[in-house]
């Protein structure tokens, strides 16, 4: 539950597999979550930049999965093929922008901003969603409050260059600190 990056995540089909998955999960954390699987899914990710109620969402992306779920190996070991470390999510194969109908993309971008505001986020976050292909329903899967690589590849595709992203993050940090200073 608390490690992120799909550490300890297992999809199971039988009770024996569930027992093994639980043993694996508790080897990483004393809290685990067992939930119904989405069998026909696409992962769609979106980044949000801002502070509090002022925010904007990037274009959406669809990372490529080697299996039914986007695993730790997919994210950080190049699909497990090379066995070596990679540059994390930034080096993962992906489709930017995600191949989605405009309405679905806008729904995910709006939901991303709503989640950003609901948790009182500041700076840049990346929110990972699961899209049930059979029902067209979107599920928020993970909120990355300090996304690896700052999700710069999503902002670059949204027209914000890396240096401009860093400048905006610094501006947000200074503004937040000024607001805190004014409270005392």
Could you say what each language-model-derived stretch is?
Residues 41, 99-184:
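ATP-dependent carboxylate activation and anion-phosphoryl transfer catalytic cores
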Residues 3-4, 85-98, 174-184:
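A short, terminal or domain-edge coil/loop segment
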Residues 13-88, 92-95, 99, 103, ...:
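Phosphate-binding site of ATP-dependent enzymes
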